[in-house]
Amino acid sequence: MTRCAVVAAVAAVLLVAGAAAAGGGEEEEAPSTCARRGPGFVDALASRCPCIRIEPSPPVEVRGEAIAKELNLRHRGVTYSVLFYAAWCPFSSKFRPIFEALSTMFPQIYHFTVEESSAMPSLFSRYGVRGFPAILLVNETTMVRYWGPKDLSSLVDFYKETTGFDPIAYFDVDHQDSTGDFRPVTPGDRSLRKIAKDEPFVLLAVLFIILKVAAHFVPIVVSHLKTFLVVRVQNLNLGIRRGSSQLLERALNVLDVKRLCSKLRLSNKTRDLRKGASNARAWASSFTSVSLGESSSSRQA
């Protein structure tokens, strides 16, 4: 009995020691890293629906040579979606969360991203990329470039129409404030200073368009204004000339009336003088006849 008790005690001690050692080994082997977090929309969806488990499928960043080789092979039954972007372009950085959402929503499509500096210009010319960001869907028979609006719902419709695949889930990227993704912004929500700070290229593009329109229409407006002023001045000069001519005619008419009056006065004076002269002649003739008669009578007496 004593031997059995000793054996049992030793076995119990060994078991406790082994458990403690195992526990210490596990603590030593525990990694000191944080688990990788998925995109913000996946975390938001998991917080809303804890029962749904969606593994994020981020796109693969490749160089230009690798994507050219992959697209040249075009494996049978494989569909590729390629995002061409530029690190300096603010639209590209804002579009990345949407492309990550598409990669998770369509895991049956291989998603790749190509940065501008990692590819030759001939690659962009080959696939018709003239601006960033640009999306290209490629399968074994077709190659389609997306030209529509770059919102999630439009891109999902484009994927479904081009590939025939349906998304495994629908995400809403536009309202994720914590991840810094797209949000619908109305013009009244942001001031001009904030727009210039957040999107300077948009402001520069708008200013360029305004200057272009002004450079086109300002000379036309100035020429029409000059023509209007010239016609207006000519009409004004004609009016002034007509008015002055009328005044001159009136002045001449007044002068003519004065001359006529003076002529009438002169004619009246000459008429009076003539009458006086004729009266004087008659009076003189009568006086001479009377004097002659008196002299003859005195002689007869």
Swiss-Prot record:
Residues of this chain annotated as glycosylated in UniProt: N139, N268
Boundaries of each Thioredoxin domain copy?
A: 51-164
Compartments where located? Membrane
Q: Which GO terms describe its cellular component?
A: membrane
Q: State the UniProt keywords alphabetically.
A: Glycoprotein, Membrane, Signal, Transmembrane, Transmembrane helix
Q: How would you describe this protein's topology in the membrane? A: Single-pass membrane protein
Signal peptide position in this chain? 1-21
Q: Which Pfam families does this entry report, sorted A to Z?
A: Thioredoxin
Superkingdom of this protein's organism: Eukaryota
Instruction: Give TM regions.
Output: 201-221
Xref: PANTHER family:
5'-ADENYLYLSULFATE REDUCTASE-LIKE 5, 5'-ADENYLYLSULFATE REDUCTASE-LIKE 7
Name-wise, this protein is: 5'-adenylylsulfate reductase-like 5
Q: What would be the name of the gene that encodes this protein?
A: APRL5
